[in-house]
Regions:
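N-terminal small/glycine-rich loop or linker at the start of catalytic domains
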Residues: 1-19, 76, 99, 129-133
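Short, acidic/polar
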Residues: 23-33, 86-96, 142-151
Length: 156
């Protein structure tokens, strides 16, 4: 049986409550607390190329910026960001080097499934772990979910 992993999205989803304004020092404290709490996957915020970066907010336009809140001792945890399909160009991502995030959660709506999955493939080719986030899941029929699962399993 596979092991269940716990993902914490405080620094991203919690940003809907405070406009992602956590403060740089608090971002680092939260991440360290999550590592110490033995959370498996820590989502550090939003990745979106078009935003203006401010270190007090968990919205990033480069993966290097995300690396500033990731502790040197990662404690075996995975660090990720969420990126909406169409708001970043996976071709522009640096190749994975272990200095920043380990993976990217690619979010897309049903109408963007093909493009979203192509983006997932490109992210994976850069060496990152890929997490597929189908948005508004209630809009999918059972058959469409099965199609999505099948197509995700084809990503190499």
């Amino acid at each position: 049986m596979r092991r269940v992993q716990l993902l914490d999205c405080t620094l991203r989803d919690g940003g809907y409550c405070n406009d992602c304004h956590f403060g740089f020092e608090n971002e680092k404290k939260i991440v360290n607390g999550l590592v110490e709490s033995n959370i498996d996957v820590i989502e550090c915020g939003f990745f979106k190329e078009s935003i203006e970066y401010d270190s007090d907010y968990t919205r990033f336009n480069s993966l290097e910026q995300v690396g500033r809140i990731i502790p040197q001792n990662r404690g075996g945890k995975l660090f990720v960001v969420l990126a909406d399909y169409g708001k970043f160009d996976p071709k522009k991502l640096p190749d994975y080097n272990g200095a920043s995030v380990d993976g990217i959660r690619v979010a897309f709506h049903k109408k963007d499934m093909s493009g979203g999955l192509e983006a997932c493939q490109k992210v994976k080719e850069k060496g990152y772990k890929v997490f597929v986030q189908a948005m508004v899941s209630v809009a999918y029929t059972d058959e469409e979910f099965l199609e999505l699962i099948s197509r995700v399993n084809e990503i190499e």
